[in-house]
A protein has these predicted regions:
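A generic secondary-structure signal for well-formed alpha-helical elements
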Residues: 21-24, 45-49, 80, 84-93, ...
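Active/binding-pocket-proximal capping segment
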Residues: 31-41, 54-58, 79-83, 91-105
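Hydrophobic alpha-helix position signal
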Residues: 2, 41-42, 89, 122, ...
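C-terminal amphipathic alpha-helical interaction region
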Residues: 94-142
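Hydrophobic alpha-helical scaffolding
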Residues: 4-5, 27-31, 50, 67-71, ...
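C-terminal substrate/ligand-recognition segments
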Residues: 9-24, 48, 53, 60-87, ...
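Long hydrophobic segments that form regular secondary structure
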Residues: 17-44, 48
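Single conserved hydrophobic/aromatic residue that forms the stacking wall/gate
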Residues: 1-11
Length: 144
């Protein structure tokens, strides 16, 4: 079974369920009860019905309507930047490092939207953002 790790667990649940939905044909999906399929999928991985996924199969349609579909992934992109920036503090050996905190404030926060956000991030990190810190935070890096 998958242990709870907060929000990271939520993403794992959704990913596992998504993989199960994509492992069947459209014809098979039309014959299924979506709620029952979801319940059986989550049980297969040792996940309880009482701990609901963030979005249930039957009401996640909002991502496919209007302009929200591309905007939804901006949350994931923000999480990439967040985890990578926090990784700088872990690399410094002190998440309360005053010098690094000042650099973050000076290179990103104080600039606001006066410069391109990715340029600001590169100014802080010295490179473009990478996804590895996010994968680690969400338990998707294969280390556990």
């Amino acid at each position: 079974p998958i242990g709870s790790r907060g929000l990271g667990d939520v993403y794992k649940r959704q990913s596992l369920l998504d993989m199960d939905w994509h492992s069947i044909s459209a014809e098979q999906a039309q014959q299924l009860d979506a709620n029952k399929f979801e319940s059986e999928s989550l049980k297969k991985y040792g996940l309880l019905d009482e701990i609901a996924p963030r979005y249930r199969t039957t009401y996640f349609a909002h991502i496919f309507s209007g302009g929200y579909s591309s905007g939804y992934y901006s949350y994931v992109h923000a999480a990439v930047l967040d985890s990578d920036a926090f990784e700088a503090f872990k690399e410094a050996g002190d998440v309360f490092d005053a010098e690094l905190s000042s650099r973050l404030r000076e290179t990103i926060y104080s600039k606001g939207s006066t410069e391109d956000a990715m340029d600001l991030f590169v100014n802080f990190r010295g490179r473009k953002a990478v996804i590895e810190p996010l994968l680690k935070v969400r338990g998707l890096d294969g280390s556990n």
